[in-house]
Amino acid sequence: MYNLRNRSFLNLLDFTSKDIRYLLDLSIDLKKSKYAGIEVQKLKGKNMAIIFEKDSTRTRCAFEIAAYDQGANITYLGSRGNQIGVKESMMDTARVLGRMYDAIGFRGFSQQTVECLANYSNVPVYNGLTDTAHPTQILADLMPIEEHKGSLKGVKIVFCGDGRGNVANSLLKGCAIMGLDFRIFAPKELFPDSNLTLKAKSLALDSGGKITITDSKEEAVKCADVVYTDVWVSMGENNWEDRINLLRFYQVNKEIMDMAKDSAIFMHCLPAFHDLNTVVGKDIFDKYGINGIEVTEEIFESKNSVVFDIAENRVHTIKAIVVATLG
C-alpha cells in the first residue's frame, strides 16, 4: 500500500507525481464512497487543530467536514481568542499543540510559519494557504480537470491575471509535476519568480508537460482546454487602482473564452468578484466602472463554469490528505 503516513503537506515541490496521483485517486474514491453512503471512518479518536490567521469559508468548512465525515474531532483557532503570536510564539504553540493534537491545519500569511509548525509540532501539518503557496487548492483544481477532461496529461490550461500569486505559483508547480501544458497570461510586472519558473520547466521536461509564461493573449489562450483566474488583490492587500490598471486587459470574458476550445471549462478558486452583489464588487464598479473584475458574470455563470465543482472537491481532497497522512 502507498504510504504517506506522518507526512506534512506544505509545498507541492515536496511531492512526486506518484504521490499526487495517489492523493487524487484517494480523493475520487472518498467522493464516491460519500455519495454512495458507504464511507469508512479511518480517523476515529483522532484530534486535529486548524489555525486560521486569515478568515475563510471553503477551507475551514472543508477541513471541518473532512474531519467529521472521518470520525475525527476538530478545534478551530481563529485570528482572535488565542495567544498565538501575542503571548506565545508559533514555535512554542507548535510544541504545545503537538502534544495535544494528532495533526494541525494552517491558513495564514507566512510560509515560514507553517514550516515552523511542521518542524516543532512533530505531527502532520497541512498548508491551507500562505502568501506564496496554496497546495491544497491545487489538488481540488486537478480533480475536476480530470473529471471533465478524462486525464491530466497534456491538458492545456491557462491562468489569466496575477502570475506571482499563491494560486498561480502552486498551479505552476502542480501542472509541471503532473505533465500538463500550463500557460500563465499576465503582464510582465506580474510574471512568477524566475527561479520558480526554471524549476517548473525542469519538472515539466521530466513529466512531459510544458510551461509558457507570456503577456500575449493569443499565445496563452489559443486552443486552451481550461481557463483559470483568481482575484486580483490578495487578502491583506488594498491596491485596487494599481491592479485594475495593470490587469483590466487580463479579465476572463467572452473574448478570452472564444479563443479557447469550444469545450473549454472555466475555473476559479473563489471567492470571485463577478457581479455587483458584494461590497467589493459594487465599490469597484462605482469607482472604475467595471462590472465583474477578474471574470464577467456571463462567463462565471456559463455552462462551461466548474467553479462549484472545485469548491466541493476541497472537501474530498483535504480529506484524502488527512486520511493518507494520519489514517
Curated annotation (Swiss-Prot):
KW Transferase (keyword) present: yes
EC number assigned by the record: 2.1.3.3
Cited function: Reversibly catalyzes the transfer of the carbamoyl group from carbamoyl phosphate (CP) to the N(epsilon) atom of ornithine (ORN) to produce L-citrulline.
Gene3D superfamilies, A to Z: Aspartate/ornithine carbamoyltransferase (3.40.50.1370)
Amino-acid positions noted as binding L-ornithine in the UniProt annotation, renumbered to this chain: 166, 230, 234-235
Species annotation: Borrelia garinii subsp. bavariensis (strain ATCC BAA-2496 / DSM 23469 / PBi) (Borreliella bavariensis)
GO MF, one annotated term: amino acid binding
Metabolic or biological pathway, per its Swiss-Prot or TrEMBL entry: Amino-acid degradation; L-arginine degradation via ADI pathway; carbamoyl phosphate from L-arginine: step 2/2
Name of this protein: Ornithine carbamoyltransferase, catabolic
Pfam assignment, any one: OTCace
Keyword hit for tRNA processing: no
Any one GO BP annotation for this protein: arginine biosynthetic process via ornithine
Known catalytic reactions: carbamoyl phosphate + L-ornithine = L-citrulline + phosphate + H(+)
A GO cellular component annotation in the UniProt record: cytoplasm
UniProt-annotated location(s): Cytoplasm
